[in-house]
Swiss-Prot record:
Lineage, broadest ranks: Bacteria, Pseudomonadati, Thermodesulfobacteriota, Desulfobacteria, Desulfobacterales
Spans through the membrane: none
Cited function: Forms part of the ribosomal stalk, playing a central role in the interaction of the ribosome with GTP-bound translation factors.
Molecular function via GO: large ribosomal subunit rRNA binding; structural constituent of ribosome
HAMAP family: Ribosomal_uL10
The protein's name in its UniProt record: Large ribosomal subunit protein uL10
Gene Ontology CC annotation, any one: large ribosomal subunit
Keywords carried by this UniProt record: Ribonucleoprotein, Ribosomal protein, RNA-binding, rRNA-binding
Record-linked InterPro entries: Ribosomal_uL10, Ribosomal_uL10-like_sf, Ribosomal_uL10_bac, Ribosomal_uL10_bac_type, Ribosomal_uL10_CS_bac
CDD domains associated with the record: Ribosomal_L10
BP GO terms, sorted: translation
């Protein structure tokens, strides 16, 4: 690759690294073209992209970004998955792909500028999508006022029942 081409790759990757909310390093050795195409297609559907980049170029590209913590992890053949929206969906796609392709290995990830190990990535993959989580939170927040109203209305209701019982008792006597 010519130096001008390398510079362009670094600049392009730097821009994408700045926008990425999540980055996951993988070992792609042993994957054929069809498997790589399948993986890329699944990641595109999850608003992410997958690229094989030389470690030296990747090191230059992530300088000054949240992904800079990956510098020490760039050893051996690496490919990077960059997610720009919900970090859960691409992580799910990668872990599913790793289950189905024994040669594919997830190394480590970065979320919000912090390294996330394989166990953390698996836990992230088990989370429901962002929209579902927001719906659960909204439902919980909505149930709090409803429960409070029910609780507050219970005291006068019980008083009315007691008064009704006293009235019925006096009428019967």
């Amino acid at each position: 690759m010519r130096p001008e081409d390398k510079k362009k790759v670094v600049e392009d990757l730097h821009v994408r690294a700045e926008k990425a909310k999540l980055a996951i390093l993988t070992d792609f050795r042993g994957l054929n073209v069809a498997a790589m195409s399948e993986l890329r297609k699944g990641l595109r559907a999850a608003s992410a992209e997958y690229q094989v980049v030389k470690n030296t170029l990747m090191t230059l590209a992530i300088e000054g970004t949240d992904l800079e913590v990956l510098k020490d992890e760039l050893k051996g053949p690496c490919a990077v998955c960059l997610a720009y929206e919900d970090p859960v969906e691409p992580t799910k796609a990668l872990t599913e792909f790793a289950k189905n392709n024994k040669k594919f290995e997830i190394k480590i990830g970065v979320l919000d500028g912090k390294l996330v190990n394989l166990d953390g990535l698996k836990a992230l993959a088990d989370l429901p999508p962002r929209e579902v989580l927001l719906g659960q939170i909204a439902g919980t927040l909505n149930s709090l006022p409803t429960g409070l109203v029910q609780c507050l209305a219970g005291v006068p209701r019980k008083l009315l029942y007691a008064l009704q019982a006293v009235r019925d008792q006096k009428e019967a006597a």
